[in-house]
Amino acid sequence: MSVSMREMLEAGVHFGHQTRFWNPKMAPYIFGHRNKIHIINLEKSLPLFQQAQKFVRQLAANRGTILMVGTKRQAREILATEALRAGMPFVDQRWLGGMLTNFKTVKTSIKRLKDMKAQQEAGLDSLSKKEQLTFSREIDKLEKDIGGIQDMSALPNAIFVIDVGFHKIAVAEAKKLGIALIGVVDTNHSPEGIDYVIPGNDDSAKAVALYARGIADAIIEGRANAINEVVKAVAPESSDEFVEVDESAP
């Protein structure tokens, strides 16, 4: 589903931060200011968001993985919901240092979580009450820390980040590994190093919902397009030729 200028306006995407906190590198995306608040130029934001969606659509069509990241209070629930809808991994609580650069260790934790879930399903009757409590605390912590990436078997092809400044460690890790970055950048942060910059408000819950929904929609569209292409490729070509049947034949 495409996003319109009106939707961006209604979501408050154009509201930046106070002018005294601005990053000069965001100047090309700023329309002006009002009441000491920078106003983001939506005529720049909309096509850039559409470019990001196009990239995501193509990546999803090629079975790529997009890790969705948003750990700020107003982003957590909507980001997790949209990532699950799109079938993509996500980080909605806190970014663990080394989540990408030390993925080998993270995979060990993922295996531990899956093993514990299997043990939980089988029953914990053999454990004492104290052991059950310890078990419960550990699985809850693992679920909170890496639950959103438990099905991510390899490093992602791209990362979608809401607020690049707040998630500077995630951004740095992605840059180090050459992973494509799609980032919502507000007026108080630098767009440098972000492959697909989305200039916009990173605090408004409505704006965050718009970004997350738009990216999730693009992922779903990309996968659907890929499936349609496969169906077309394997479907027998229909023939409109008229074939006469000889009814006298035995």
From Swiss-Prot:
* InterPro entries named among the record's database cross-references: Ribosomal_uS2, Ribosomal_uS2_bac/mit/plastid, Ribosomal_uS2_CS, Ribosomal_uS2_flav_dom_sf
GO CC term, one of those recorded: cytosolic small ribosomal subunit
One Gene Ontology BP term is:
translation
Name any one GO molecular function: structural constituent of ribosome
Q: Which domain of life is it from?
A: Bacteria
- Which segments of the protein form a coiled coil according to its record? none
Is Endoplasmic reticulum given among the entry's keywords? no
Q: Which UniProt keywords apply?
A: Ribonucleoprotein, Ribosomal protein
Per the UniProt entry, the disulfide pairs are none
- Which positions make up the signal peptide? none
**Which Gene3D superfamilies does this chain map to?**
Glucose-6-phosphate isomerase like protein, domain 1, Helix hairpin bin
Which family, according to the similarity comment? Answer: Belongs to the universal ribosomal protein uS2 family.
Q: Which HAMAP family match?
A: Ribosomal_uS2_B
**Can you say what this protein is called?**
Small ribosomal subunit protein uS2
The organism encoding this protein is Verminephrobacter eiseniae (strain EF01-2)
The uppermost taxa in this organism's lineage are: Bacteria, Pseudomonadati, Pseudomonadota, Betaproteobacteria, Burkholderiales
